Amino acid sequence: FTDLKFRVVLSPRSSKKIYEKGIESIPSESVCYPAKLSHGHIESLIEKGIKYIFYPSVAYERKENVTQGNHYNCPVVTSYPEVIRNNVDNLETNEIIFRNPFMDLSNRKTMFTNLKDEFKSFGISDKELKAAIEHAYEELQQCRLDIQGEGETVLAYLKENNMTGVVLSGRPYHVDPEINHGLADLITGEGMAVLTEDSVCHLDKELEELRVVDQWTYHSRMYHAASFVSSQPNLQLIQLTSFGCGLDAVTADQVAEILNARNKIYTLIKIDEGSNLGAIRIRIRSLKATIDKQENKEIDLSKKYKPVKVPFTKEMKDDRWTILCPQMSPIHFQFVEKAMQESGYNLKVLPSVDKGATEAGLKYVNNDACYPSI
């Protein structure tokens, strides 16, 4: 934007006051705290007199390693600009130009096409726009390299001084002090260094396969960070999740499995707008005490994480093994059973969900999982 001669104005740092500014337009109490905060940030920009707000819907991140099946953003990150557009009345009242184009950070051609359409009223030439996009990607890459370099510097310091480090693993917005409530300070206060998952995930060379589908860029960072931590005797991992995040119900179980393969401690901390850290402080001190007890314990590097999957073989198909299919949509699934049977699979769609099915599901599914999973 600076290259294109725009004056860039950012909203203030997140705070409880910012959160309260937007509380009236939040449509769902169950959405995560970072999403709730965005309402306050938009209201803050409106109060500053900003007449043009750019809040893109980023559906795809960049693919950061070859093991990823895809590179989506979470549905909330992808679609929340639409929620803002339809719920923040002050955008219309103050005649704000609100732009939220859907963008794919992994495809520079579509980035150019979308931004050209977005900025056509500003008279920006194709040459100027292409140069600005290239510069932006260069800055993004340099930022990634800077973070990775800092991570490697901290790791070298820990090894040299025989210290313990904690990888505070989460999503990019968990770096926001208002969202993490100063959790990193609690950890350093116990004499341990803090690293982020994206400062070490590039160092993992072991993780090849997962139990879950690896199609989210930020999830992939967590998995590779966990794999790297599992191979380092002086590192531990704490996963940070926001209340209401259904996707992290998946990552929490997978990260725990990766760490447990080498008997590493898995610590999960859930946070929301509440800033009382008493219980969290106790958990960190307990982690520190456990680490001290295991100080001289060696890691068996021969124990690599291998997901347990049940294959469906051609022999099973030929022997007419039954495939049970949960009822997800009565309108569509009435055709699924017949279509699969015509294709040679003995598939049975389960009956519609009742109270008993829900209660049974709750016994086996992560508490944060969405209702269809249960």
Regions picked out by a protein language model, each given a short descriptive name:
Residues 2-374:
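An N-terminal assembly and electron-transfer interface module characteristic of large anaerobic redox
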